[in-house]
Regions:
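Glycine-rich phosphate-binding loops at beta-strand->alpha-helix junctions
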Residues: 240-263
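Oxyanion-binding "anion nests"
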Residues: 169-195
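Glycine-rich phosphate-binding loop of actin/hexokinase-like ATP-binding domains
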Residues: 66-171
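Phosphate/pyrophosphate-binding loops at sites that engage ATP/ADP/AMP, CoA/4′-phosphopantetheine
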Residues: 1, 106-113, 229-240
Length: 316
């Protein structure tokens, strides 16, 4: 028996999954300040499993590890450099296990070596992020210091002008904790519409004439995703493929259609009939499209299991 643990944040300490020992746990704890809600709980989970299953080999897989290959110009913020040196404030990204899994699968599906491919992977769910994958390595991603950054999400704001935050804090007399709650749990599509924070409900409402805010929210969602994809064409110096994954990416037909149609100028042509599927692996671009688009259901558990098996076999 072997056991794999998903860890939200590995900071700059982990660029791949790691065998769990006392040193690994200490390192996870040392970056807990970057994920205060997740890393301490993950350590408790690891220790509980160690107590329940003594001697069973365990491996930690990090959501941030895949993005440790980003070049410095893509992760350093344009603020005083000392804050990076003192506090580790930089872009870390998230959903790395998912982005890596679907990028590898895309290469398999098109029958090409991933080292020769430029792919944009779109993990779209309650939390959502976009990743530029060059030769199998992450070189840019939309989430930042935390999973709050990037595209507008169901309850998260995504990227904002920082003065929006200070203005609201002053006007509403909010504490840092209060504004953190506002931006993480009360913003995004939910904040715009006031509807239940369920993407499916918001999308359905967007087709109703008396729900203009729902239509606005969906337009913002698909537009910002398309903008990030276009932006990553610069990072990658071209795009060979786009992958949609995650609950929204795999199941919301019209969302994929809207995003792809916004990118027609890049030579992406969507096959309307092929796109009419939910939760299935499918090519959704036409044969004459300059960019190949796929739906690829993610399987983070399988990816973690594979890493766990490989690492445990190495140390035997």
């Amino acid at each position: 028996m072997q056991f794999g643990h998903r860890i939200v944040h590995g900071g700059e300490l982990f660029s791949e999954s790691a065998y769990i020992n006392d040193e690994t746990i200490a390192k996870i704890d040392s970056v807990a300040g970057l994920a205060p809600l997740h890393n301490p709980a993950a350590i408790l989970g690891i220790k509980a499993c160690q107590n329940a299953m003594p001697g069973v080999p365990m491996v930690a897989a990090f959501d941030t590890a895949f993005h440790q290959t980003m070049p410095k110009e893509n992760y350093i913020y344009p603020i005083p450099y000392e804050y990076y040196e003192k506090y580790g404030i930089r872009k870390y990204g998230a959903h790395g296990t998912s982005h890596q899994f679907v990028a590898k699968r895309f290469a398999e599906l098109v029958g090409k070596n991933i080292e020769n491919l430029k792919i944009v992977t779109c993990h779209l769910g309650q939390g959502a992020s976009i990743c530029a994958v060059d030769g199998g390595k992450s070189i840019n991603t939309s989430m930042g210091l935390s999973p709050l950054g990037g595209i507008a999400m169901v309850t998260r704001s995504g990227d904002l002008d920082p003065s929006v935050v200070t203005e609201i804090m002053e006007k509403e007399n909010l504490t840092p904790k209060g504004v953190n709650t506002l931006l993480n749990k009360k913003s995004g599509l939910y904040g715009i519409t006031g509807l239940n924070p369920d993407f499916r409900e918001i999308e359905l409402a967007s087709y109703e004439e008396d729900k203009p805010k729902a239509k606005l929210a969906i337009n913002i969602f698909t537009k910002t995703i398309a903008e990030f994809i276009a932006k990553y064409a610069v990072s990658l110096n071209g795009i060979d493929g786009i992958v949609f994954t995650g609950g929204i990416g795999e199941n919301q037909i019209n969302v994929r259609k809207s995003i792809c149609e916004r990118l027609e100028w890049m030579g992406l042509k969507i096959d309307i009939d092929a796109n009419n599927v939910k939760g299935e692996e499918a090519k959704i671009s036409t044969d004459d499209s300059k960019i190949i688009a796929y739906i690829i259901p993610t399987d983070e558990e399988l990816a973690i299991a594979r890493d766990t098996k490989a690492i445990v076999e190495k140390i035997k």
